[in-house]
């Protein structure tokens, strides 16, 4: 076990003839590795200092000595006023951030039971908010100006071309589908009205014919009585 320290083949010598690792008995109770290597550490690293300005300059720095290394108070900070100023600036920034966060929380806090409904959440032209069992579309409500313009167009043209339908939709701020549906409904209404008028005219003509027949029969009866 002691062959590592006593083997002459593993030992090397300096120019002065001193051994780098002199043979020391492991069983010696007074062996101190720090004190043992301190002369060589002092000889090799004597007066070794750091040129970095962040480290303090100390003379006679000996590496491997038994005493602990004493770092300077200004090792990491060159100016002693840097740390207080940084703390003061950080405190102000933290205070402003806390105030902003509190104000934002005060603005955004709403009662839990209230749910805000935005316009994009509602269905267009729906008579009921939400998606229940009744999902029918509500009737499109046209303004008086839109209705008047559509009636004028229907008076001249019962059917529209695609080009004319696009022009009317752009003029009245409506969609092509709305124009198409309006004209379909208007044609149905017009047919009903025309059928009703024709029926009334037929009934009126039949009633007038019956009245004339009654008058003729009455005249003939009077003539027969006189005869």
From Swiss-Prot:
Database matches in CDD domains: homeodomain
Annotated region (Disordered), positions in chain = 200-227
Q: Where is this motif: Antp-type hexapeptide?
A: 117-122
Alphabetically ordered keywords of this record? Developmental protein, DNA-binding, Homeobox, Nucleus, Transcription, Transcription regulation
What domain of life does the UniProt record list for this protein's source? Answer: Eukaryota
UniProt xrefs under Pfam families? Homeodomain (PF00046)
Q: Which InterPro entries match?
A: Antp_homeobox, HD, HD_metazoa, Homeobox_Antennapedia_CS, Homeobox_CS, Homeodomain-like_sf
Give the UniProt subcellular location, in the record's own words: Nucleus
Which spans does this entry mark as compositional bias, Basic and acidic residues? 211-227
Statement: the UniProt record of this protein carries the keyword Iron-sulfur: no
Q: Name one GO molecular function term.
A: RNA polymerase II cis-regulatory region sequence-specific DNA binding
Q: Which PROSITE patterns match?
A: ANTENNAPEDIA (PS00032), HOMEOBOX_1 (PS00027), HOMEOBOX_2 (PS50071)
Q: Which GO terms describe its biological process?
A: anterior/posterior pattern specification; regulation of transcription by RNA polymerase II
Point out the DNA-binding stretch(es).
135-194
Q: Which GO terms describe its cellular component?
A: nucleus
Principal cellular location given in the protein's record: nucleus
Q: What does this gene product do?
A: Sequence-specific transcription factor which is part of a developmental regulatory system that provides cells with specific positional identities on the anterior-posterior axis.
Q: Please report which protein family the annotation says this sequence is part of.
A: Belongs to the Antp homeobox family.
Its protein name is: Homeobox protein Hox-C6b
Name the gene for this chain. Answer: hoxc6b
